[in-house]
């Protein structure tokens, strides 16, 4: 199977692995043959920083399953969750270099690499997650975003989501003044940090793998994530309250290295 056919199969997979899912090292080839035919086989890694029991993992695994099915078993994608291949920044860098062809991750860390992805970082823009999905599913919007990723050295294959991000804390929040001084963990995203700073909180960028122990040791007072992430990582063991800020949708992108794609 040549590269053009491989790319075509990936594009077909994209149609099966979009937002509807949430509502419900380089190429390594080996050749094996018979007297009748010779089959080229391929294997590639897909990296993610998310835990295994999340929509992100389900999205990645579904993509891998469809690639294998549509290729008749000649293409295999191995999914590596939990930052096994690196954190968000490292995954983006490795993907751009072509070392890790596929990455599934939240869009927030991508602002440093592609500033126009900040369109997803405008707080309080949407009232419902259905609104978010309607906009992201819009073909014109998708075309614009695909160009953004292409210009950044990637190709965008699709989006999924984990709902809205909410805040957890050990301090009861009943009005805006209650945000003041709270050390809240954020991702390394200037727009996220500006939002919490304007509420009077003290935003503290931190790698997600350090959040639980940060809450345990008092390095941070609060954090913000979608419910699924909070539950799967047992952050409720260190936090007393959930504040349904619903300030941002948590979008997940499936991207591929442009170098690999070409």
What are these regions (language model features)?
Residues 134:
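Short beta-strand-centered segments that line the small-molecule binding cleft or hinge
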Residues 1-43:
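Short, low-complexity disordered leader/linker segments with a strong preference
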Residues 25-131, 140, 147-262:
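N-terminal secretory/targeting leader peptides
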């Amino acid at each position: 199977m040549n590269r053009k056919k491989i790319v075509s199969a990936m594009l077909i997979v994209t149609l099966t692995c979009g937002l509807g899912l949430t509502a419900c090292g380089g190429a390594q080839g080996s050749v094996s043959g018979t007297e009748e035919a010779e089959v080229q086989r391929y294997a590639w890694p897909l990296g993610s920083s998310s835990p295994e029991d999340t929509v992100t993992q389900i999205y990645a695994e579904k993509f891998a399953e469809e690639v294998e099915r549509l290729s008749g078993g000649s293409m295999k994608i191995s999914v590596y969750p939990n930052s096994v291949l690196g954190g968000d920044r490292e995954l983006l860098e490795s993907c751009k270099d072509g070392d890790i062809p596929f990455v599934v991750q939240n869009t927030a860390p991508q602002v440093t690499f592609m500033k126009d992805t900040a369109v997803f970082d405008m707080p309080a823009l949407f009232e419902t997650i259905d609104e978010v999905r309607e906009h992201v599913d819009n073909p014109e919007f998708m075309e614009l975003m695909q160009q953004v990723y292409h210009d950044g050295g990637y190709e965008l294959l699709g989006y999924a989501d984990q709902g809205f991000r909410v805040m957890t804390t050990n301090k009861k929040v009943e009005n805006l003044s209650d945000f003041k001084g709270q050390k809240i963990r954020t991702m390394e995203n200037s727009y996220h940090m500006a939002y919490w700073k304007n509420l009077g909180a003290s935003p503290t960028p931190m790698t997600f793998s350090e959040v639980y122990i940060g809450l345990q040791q008092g390095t941070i007072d609060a954090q913000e994530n979608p419910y699924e992430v909070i539950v799967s990582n047992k952050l409720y063991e260190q936090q007393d309250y959930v504040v349904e800020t619903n300030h941002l949708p948590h979008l997940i992108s499936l991207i591929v290295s442009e170098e690999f794609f070409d």
